[in-house]
């Protein structure tokens, strides 16, 4: 594939993603908090700091991996980096493979560090990238963490995608052992299972982003790029973010779990944190805001999002993220069925 074709593919991904809408039915709507009428705290008491063994985020919300690798996506990364700088959010760039192959493309990613020199930035590579390239990806952005995206359904629907996956787990293990910053194993919208969590724990992984279905749909994106658009029947493949978080429950004491995929509102973010996530990521909401409404409006959107999270936590009488994990939740029969059939041990305060 030529560099021009890769740039074109990057732009196609963004164009199709922006045109997508959230799933009509979300598993976030299948879980409810129990309301208690008189909080014992005030809004100003809320501490939204997200703390993991290696990363401290001012807020448990981050701009998730999206793009880079073309002139248009450079402009997007520049604007998102300004939003991150002005709001204190962490930010992940999209796959840096284009820059690792072609130094001419490096600026489409490094613009994020240029515009946000003191901020928290996650670099991003695929599960098949050599260890040396993973190290380069971290150095390229002076990144505080490295996302490794695992995207086998996307690759298999992508006309020119990868068809070989047998080395992925061993390669991830090699990267985790060599890279000095936290390595986050990131799905891309298909969710994670307890079996995967077991495998990742065995090779020393300490961070995952479950990225469940319900948000940006890469099966649909790649199917749109197929000549016959003949794989639309896989549109609903995978686990939702709620299901994925429940799958991780037994591993949350050893692995820091981030949640993304289909988060629409501050309430969805709070529900994710209550299910054990340490932070929540969103991609398309930020992309649409910054492209359609500009930087200032997106900054205001983030500030409002954070204030709404504080309001919800006050209603829940939760001073911090750890408190949220003790709050009572009522699940729908469908979610309860998933818990039962998957033999998940869910114990709450």
UniProtKB/Swiss-Prot annotation:
Record's keyword terms, sorted: Cytoplasm, Flavoprotein, FMN, Isomerase, Isoprene biosynthesis, Magnesium, Metal-binding, NADP
Record localization: Cytoplasm
GO biological processes: isoprenoid biosynthetic process
Role according to the record: Involved in the biosynthesis of isoprenoids. Catalyzes the 1,3-allylic rearrangement of the homoallylic substrate isopentenyl (IPP) to its allylic isomer, dimethylallyl diphosphate (DMAPP).
Name listed for the protein in its UniProt record: Isopentenyl-diphosphate delta-isomerase
Enzyme Commission number(s) from the entry: 5.3.3.2
Primary subcellular site in the record, as a coarse category: cytoplasm
Pfam family membership, one: FMN_dh
Taxonomic lineage: Bacteria, Bacillati, Bacillota, Bacilli, Bacillales
